Protein backbone atom coordinates (compact mmCIF):
# COMPACT_ATOMS: atom_id res chain seq x y z
CA UNK A 1 0.00 0.00 0.00
CA UNK A 2 1.33 3.47 -0.90
CA UNK A 3 2.12 5.98 1.83
CA UNK A 4 -0.57 8.32 0.47
CA UNK A 5 -3.16 5.52 0.72
CA UNK A 6 -2.16 5.00 4.35
CA UNK A 7 -2.62 8.71 5.07
CA UNK A 8 -6.00 8.92 3.34
CA UNK A 9 -7.03 5.80 5.25
CA UNK A 10 -6.21 7.51 8.54
CA UNK A 11 -8.33 10.49 7.51
CA UNK A 12 -11.20 8.16 6.56
CA UNK A 13 -11.25 6.94 10.16
CA UNK A 14 -12.56 10.39 11.20
CA UNK A 15 -15.50 10.21 8.78
CA UNK A 16 -18.84 11.10 10.36
CA UNK A 17 -17.17 12.82 13.30
CA UNK A 18 -16.65 16.29 14.75
CA UNK A 19 -13.24 17.93 15.16
CA UNK A 20 -13.16 20.74 17.73
CA UNK A 21 -10.77 23.67 18.18
CA UNK A 22 -9.31 23.79 21.71
CA UNK A 23 -6.82 26.11 23.36
CA UNK A 24 -6.23 24.31 26.68
CA UNK A 25 -6.01 20.71 27.92
CA UNK A 26 -9.21 21.36 29.88
CA UNK A 27 -11.08 22.26 26.69
CA UNK A 28 -9.64 19.19 24.97
CA UNK A 29 -11.00 16.99 27.78
CA UNK A 30 -14.45 18.59 27.36
CA UNK A 31 -14.29 17.93 23.61
CA UNK A 32 -13.30 14.29 24.11
CA UNK A 33 -16.02 13.79 26.72
CA UNK A 34 -18.57 15.27 24.31
CA UNK A 35 -17.65 12.74 21.64
CA UNK A 36 -15.27 14.66 19.37
CA UNK A 37 -13.33 12.37 17.03
CA UNK A 38 -10.28 14.69 17.21
CA UNK A 39 -9.23 18.11 18.47
CA UNK A 40 -7.37 20.97 16.81
CA UNK A 41 -4.80 22.44 19.23
CA UNK A 42 -4.53 26.23 18.96
CA UNK A 43 -3.26 29.12 21.07
CA UNK A 44 -6.23 31.23 19.95
CA UNK A 45 -9.49 30.27 18.30
CA UNK A 46 -10.20 31.85 14.89
CA UNK A 47 -12.61 34.47 16.27
CA UNK A 48 -9.82 35.84 18.48
CA UNK A 49 -7.24 35.62 15.68
CA UNK A 50 -9.57 37.63 13.46
CA UNK A 51 -9.83 40.40 16.06
CA UNK A 52 -6.11 40.57 16.80
CA UNK A 53 -4.86 41.83 13.44
CA UNK A 54 -1.50 40.25 14.30
CA UNK A 55 0.63 37.71 12.45
CA UNK A 56 -0.75 34.27 13.36
CA UNK A 57 1.77 31.42 13.42
CA UNK A 58 2.06 27.78 14.49
CA UNK A 59 1.14 27.36 18.16
CA UNK A 60 3.77 26.72 20.84
CA UNK A 61 4.71 23.02 20.62
CA UNK A 62 4.70 22.79 24.42
CA UNK A 63 1.03 23.79 24.50
CA UNK A 64 0.22 21.28 21.75
CA UNK A 65 2.09 18.54 23.65
CA UNK A 66 0.10 19.29 26.83
CA UNK A 67 -3.11 18.81 24.87
CA UNK A 68 -1.77 15.59 23.32
CA UNK A 69 -1.04 14.26 26.81
CA UNK A 70 -4.50 15.21 28.10
CA UNK A 71 -6.62 13.21 25.64
CA UNK A 72 -6.62 9.85 23.87
CA UNK A 73 -8.26 11.06 20.63
CA UNK A 74 -6.16 12.35 17.69
CA UNK A 75 -4.70 15.85 17.94
CA UNK A 76 -4.29 18.15 14.95
CA UNK A 77 -2.34 21.40 14.76
CA UNK A 78 -2.13 24.21 12.22
CA UNK A 79 0.78 25.53 10.18
CA UNK A 80 1.00 28.54 7.92
CA UNK A 81 0.48 28.00 4.20
CA UNK A 82 3.84 27.19 2.65
CA UNK A 83 5.72 26.95 5.98
CA UNK A 84 7.22 23.49 5.61
CA UNK A 85 9.55 24.01 8.60
CA UNK A 86 6.58 24.50 10.94
CA UNK A 87 5.27 21.23 9.47
CA UNK A 88 8.62 19.52 10.10
CA UNK A 89 8.43 20.62 13.75
CA UNK A 90 4.89 19.30 14.17
CA UNK A 91 5.79 16.00 12.53
CA UNK A 92 8.71 15.67 14.97
CA UNK A 93 6.25 16.41 17.79
CA UNK A 94 4.16 13.49 16.44
CA UNK A 95 0.85 15.27 16.05
CA UNK A 96 -1.71 13.06 14.33
CA UNK A 97 -2.64 15.47 11.52
CA UNK A 98 -1.39 18.85 10.25
CA UNK A 99 -3.75 21.53 8.92
CA UNK A 100 -2.08 23.83 6.37
CA UNK A 101 -4.44 26.64 7.22
CA UNK A 102 -5.57 29.92 5.71
CA UNK A 103 -6.58 30.98 9.24
CA UNK A 104 -2.89 31.61 9.98
CA UNK A 105 -0.84 34.26 8.18
CA UNK A 106 0.65 32.69 5.01
CA UNK A 107 4.41 32.19 4.94
CA UNK A 108 4.49 31.73 1.15
CA UNK A 109 2.07 33.54 -1.16
CA UNK A 110 3.07 31.40 -4.15
CA UNK A 111 3.43 27.80 -3.00
CA UNK A 112 1.64 25.46 -0.63
CA UNK A 113 3.63 22.78 1.23
CA UNK A 114 4.63 19.71 -0.79
CA UNK A 115 2.79 17.34 1.51
CA UNK A 116 4.05 14.12 -0.09
CA UNK A 117 7.37 14.87 1.66
CA UNK A 118 5.77 14.11 5.05
CA UNK A 119 4.56 10.93 6.73
CA UNK A 120 1.89 12.74 8.78
CA UNK A 121 -1.45 13.28 6.98
CA UNK A 122 -2.39 16.84 6.02
CA UNK A 123 -5.74 18.64 6.02
CA UNK A 124 -6.26 21.59 3.65
CA UNK A 125 -9.09 24.00 2.92
CA UNK A 126 -10.77 24.53 -0.45
CA UNK A 127 -13.53 26.73 -1.76
CA UNK A 128 -13.88 25.11 -5.20
CA UNK A 129 -12.96 21.93 -7.06
CA UNK A 130 -9.73 23.32 -8.53
CA UNK A 131 -8.36 24.23 -5.09
CA UNK A 132 -9.38 20.87 -3.66
CA UNK A 133 -7.68 18.90 -6.44
CA UNK A 134 -4.51 21.02 -6.29
CA UNK A 135 -4.21 20.34 -2.57
CA UNK A 136 -4.83 16.61 -3.10
CA UNK A 137 -2.20 16.55 -5.84
CA UNK A 138 0.25 18.10 -3.33
CA UNK A 139 -0.57 15.29 -0.90
CA UNK A 140 -3.52 16.45 1.24
CA UNK A 141 -5.26 13.43 2.78
CA UNK A 142 -8.35 15.40 3.83
CA UNK A 143 -10.13 18.43 2.41
CA UNK A 144 -12.38 20.80 4.36
CA UNK A 145 -14.47 23.68 3.14
CA UNK A 146 -12.79 26.96 3.99
CA UNK A 147 -16.00 28.64 5.06
CA UNK A 148 -15.23 31.86 6.89
CA UNK A 149 -13.51 30.95 10.15
CA UNK A 150 -14.23 32.86 13.33
CA UNK A 151 -17.56 34.33 12.20
CA UNK A 152 -20.28 31.91 13.27
CA UNK A 153 -21.78 32.53 9.79
CA UNK A 154 -22.19 29.20 8.00
CA UNK A 155 -23.06 30.66 4.58
CA UNK A 156 -19.53 30.51 3.13
CA UNK A 157 -19.14 26.85 4.08
CA UNK A 158 -22.46 26.16 2.38
CA UNK A 159 -21.26 28.05 -0.71
CA UNK A 160 -18.02 26.08 -0.89
CA UNK A 161 -19.45 22.56 -0.54
CA UNK A 162 -22.25 23.43 -2.96
CA UNK A 163 -19.76 24.77 -5.51
CA UNK A 164 -17.50 21.72 -5.33
CA UNK A 165 -20.47 19.39 -5.84
CA UNK A 166 -21.88 21.51 -8.68
CA UNK A 167 -18.54 21.64 -10.50
CA UNK A 168 -18.15 17.86 -10.29
CA UNK A 169 -21.63 17.40 -11.77
CA UNK A 170 -21.07 20.04 -14.45
CA UNK A 171 -17.77 18.57 -15.59
CA UNK A 172 -19.18 15.03 -15.58
CA UNK A 173 -21.87 16.18 -18.00
CA UNK A 174 -19.74 18.44 -20.21
CA UNK A 175 -16.35 16.76 -20.54
CA UNK A 176 -16.68 14.15 -23.28
CA UNK A 177 -13.37 13.79 -25.11
CA UNK A 178 -9.74 13.39 -24.11
CA UNK A 179 -9.08 16.93 -25.32
CA UNK A 180 -11.94 18.20 -23.10
CA UNK A 181 -10.38 16.52 -20.07
CA UNK A 182 -6.90 17.75 -20.95
CA UNK A 183 -8.07 21.34 -21.38
CA UNK A 184 -9.98 21.36 -18.08
CA UNK A 185 -7.08 19.72 -16.21
CA UNK A 186 -4.75 22.40 -17.58
CA UNK A 187 -7.18 25.12 -16.53
CA UNK A 188 -7.43 23.67 -13.00
CA UNK A 189 -3.65 23.01 -12.86
CA UNK A 190 -4.08 19.35 -11.91
CA UNK A 191 -3.17 15.99 -13.52
CA UNK A 192 -5.81 14.74 -15.92
CA UNK A 193 -5.95 11.34 -14.15
CA UNK A 194 -6.87 13.00 -10.85
CA UNK A 195 -9.67 14.93 -12.56
CA UNK A 196 -10.95 11.78 -14.28
CA UNK A 197 -10.92 9.79 -11.03
CA UNK A 198 -12.88 12.50 -9.22
CA UNK A 199 -15.52 12.75 -11.94
CA UNK A 200 -15.79 8.97 -12.24
CA UNK A 201 -16.42 8.62 -8.49
CA UNK A 202 -18.66 11.70 -8.38
CA UNK A 203 -16.81 12.97 -5.30
CA UNK A 204 -13.38 13.94 -4.09
CA UNK A 205 -10.98 10.98 -3.75
CA UNK A 206 -10.31 11.95 -0.11
CA UNK A 207 -12.64 12.63 2.80
CA UNK A 208 -14.29 16.08 2.67
CA UNK A 209 -15.26 17.82 5.93
CA UNK A 210 -17.16 21.05 6.57
CA UNK A 211 -15.46 23.96 8.32
CA UNK A 212 -15.85 27.68 8.81
CA UNK A 213 -18.78 29.30 10.62
CA UNK A 214 -20.39 26.20 12.18
CA UNK A 215 -22.04 27.42 15.39
CA UNK A 216 -25.15 25.28 15.99
CA UNK A 217 -26.29 21.66 15.72
CA UNK A 218 -28.49 22.73 12.80
CA UNK A 219 -25.43 24.15 11.00
CA UNK A 220 -23.64 20.82 11.37
CA UNK A 221 -26.67 18.86 10.13
CA UNK A 222 -27.12 21.23 7.19
CA UNK A 223 -23.58 20.66 5.97
CA UNK A 224 -23.86 16.91 6.44
CA UNK A 225 -27.09 16.88 4.40
CA UNK A 226 -25.28 18.86 1.69
CA UNK A 227 -22.74 16.05 1.40
CA UNK A 228 -19.94 16.79 3.86
CA UNK A 229 -18.47 13.76 5.60
CA UNK A 230 -17.77 15.34 8.99
CA UNK A 231 -17.51 18.74 10.65
CA UNK A 232 -14.85 21.03 12.09
CA UNK A 233 -16.14 23.39 14.80
CA UNK A 234 -13.92 26.28 15.78
CA UNK A 235 -15.02 29.36 17.68
CA UNK A 236 -18.66 28.31 18.04
CA UNK A 237 -18.34 25.92 20.98
CA UNK A 238 -16.17 27.79 23.44
CA UNK A 239 -17.74 31.16 22.58
CA UNK A 240 -21.09 29.83 23.83
CA UNK A 241 -22.44 29.96 27.39
CA UNK A 242 -22.51 26.16 27.86
CA UNK A 243 -19.65 24.69 25.79
CA UNK A 244 -20.01 21.08 26.90
CA UNK A 245 -23.73 20.93 26.21
CA UNK A 246 -23.28 22.55 22.79
CA UNK A 247 -20.35 20.25 21.96
CA UNK A 248 -22.46 17.17 22.76
CA UNK A 249 -25.34 18.56 20.70
CA UNK A 250 -23.17 19.20 17.63
CA UNK A 251 -21.73 15.68 17.83
CA UNK A 252 -25.25 14.23 18.03
CA UNK A 253 -26.46 16.42 15.17
CA UNK A 254 -23.59 15.27 12.98
CA UNK A 255 -24.59 11.66 13.64
CA UNK A 256 -28.37 12.17 13.33
CA UNK A 257 -28.21 14.84 10.62
CA UNK A 258 -31.17 13.42 8.67
CA UNK A 259 -33.54 12.98 11.64
CA UNK A 260 -35.58 16.19 12.22
CA UNK A 261 -37.21 14.87 15.40
CA UNK A 262 -33.81 14.16 16.93
CA UNK A 263 -32.46 17.52 15.72
CA UNK A 264 -35.38 19.31 17.38
CA UNK A 265 -34.55 17.63 20.68
CA UNK A 266 -30.82 18.33 20.30
CA UNK A 267 -31.30 22.02 19.44
CA UNK A 268 -33.34 22.96 22.52
CA UNK A 269 -32.06 24.79 25.63
CA UNK A 270 -28.46 25.28 24.51
CA UNK A 271 -28.00 28.64 26.21
CA UNK A 272 -26.45 31.68 24.55
CA UNK A 273 -24.68 30.81 21.30
CA UNK A 274 -21.79 32.66 19.65
CA UNK A 275 -22.96 36.11 18.52
CA UNK A 276 -20.83 36.03 15.40
CA UNK A 277 -20.08 38.33 12.49
CA UNK A 278 -22.08 38.36 9.26
CA UNK A 279 -20.12 37.72 6.07
CA UNK A 280 -21.48 40.96 4.59
CA UNK A 281 -19.62 42.97 7.25
CA UNK A 282 -16.23 41.62 6.11
CA UNK A 283 -14.39 42.89 3.06
CA UNK A 284 -11.33 41.44 1.36
CA UNK A 285 -9.12 44.35 2.43
CA UNK A 286 -9.93 43.88 6.09
CA UNK A 287 -11.27 46.21 8.77
CA UNK A 288 -12.53 45.89 12.32
CA UNK A 289 -13.83 42.38 11.54
CA UNK A 290 -10.68 41.28 9.71
CA UNK A 291 -10.26 40.21 6.10
CA UNK A 292 -11.84 37.35 4.15
CA UNK A 293 -9.71 34.39 5.24
CA UNK A 294 -11.36 32.12 2.67
CA UNK A 295 -9.71 34.13 -0.12
CA UNK A 296 -6.25 33.08 1.09
CA UNK A 297 -4.81 30.19 -0.91
CA UNK A 298 -4.33 29.46 -4.59
From Swiss-Prot:
GO BP of this protein: amino acid metabolic process; pyridoxal phosphate biosynthetic process; pyridoxine biosynthetic process; thiamine biosynthetic process; vitamin B6 biosynthetic process
Intrachain S-S bonds: none
Pfam hit, one: SOR_SNZ
Pathway membership: Cofactor biosynthesis; pyridoxal 5'-phosphate biosynthesis
Induction annotation: By the absence of external thiamine.
Residues that hold D-ribose 5-phosphate according to the record: 21, 150, 213, 234-235
Enzyme Commission number(s) from the entry: 4.3.3.6
GO molecular function: amine-lyase activity; GMP synthase (glutamine-hydrolyzing) activity; pyridoxal 5'-phosphate synthase (glutamine hydrolysing) activity
Active-site residues annotated for this sequence: 78 (schiff-base intermediate with d-ribose 5-phosphate)
Record-stated family: Belongs to the PdxS/SNZ family.
HAMAP family in UniProt: PdxS (MF_01824)
Subunit field text: Homohexamer. Interacts with THI11.
Purpose: Catalyzes the formation of pyridoxal 5'-phosphate from ribose 5-phosphate (RBP), glyceraldehyde 3-phosphate (G3P) and ammonia. The ammonia is provided by a SNO isoform. Can also use ribulose 5-phosphate and dihydroxyacetone phosphate as substrates, resulting from enzyme-catalyzed isomerization of RBP and G3P, respectively.
Protein name from the UniProt record: Probable pyridoxal 5'-phosphate synthase subunit SNZ2
Native species: Saccharomyces cerevisiae (strain ATCC 204508 / S288c) (Baker's yeast)
Taxonomic placement: Eukaryota, Fungi, Dikarya, Ascomycota, Saccharomycotina
Gene name linked to the record: SNZ2
Amino acid sequence: MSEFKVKTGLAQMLKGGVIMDVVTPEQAIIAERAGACAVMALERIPADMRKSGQVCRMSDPRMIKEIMEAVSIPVMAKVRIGHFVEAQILEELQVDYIDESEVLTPADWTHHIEKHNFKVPFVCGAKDLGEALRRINEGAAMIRTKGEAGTGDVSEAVKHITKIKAEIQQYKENLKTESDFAAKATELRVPVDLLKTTLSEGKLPVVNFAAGGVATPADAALLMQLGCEGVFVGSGIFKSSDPEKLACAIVEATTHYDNPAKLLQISSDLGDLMGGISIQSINEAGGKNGARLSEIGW
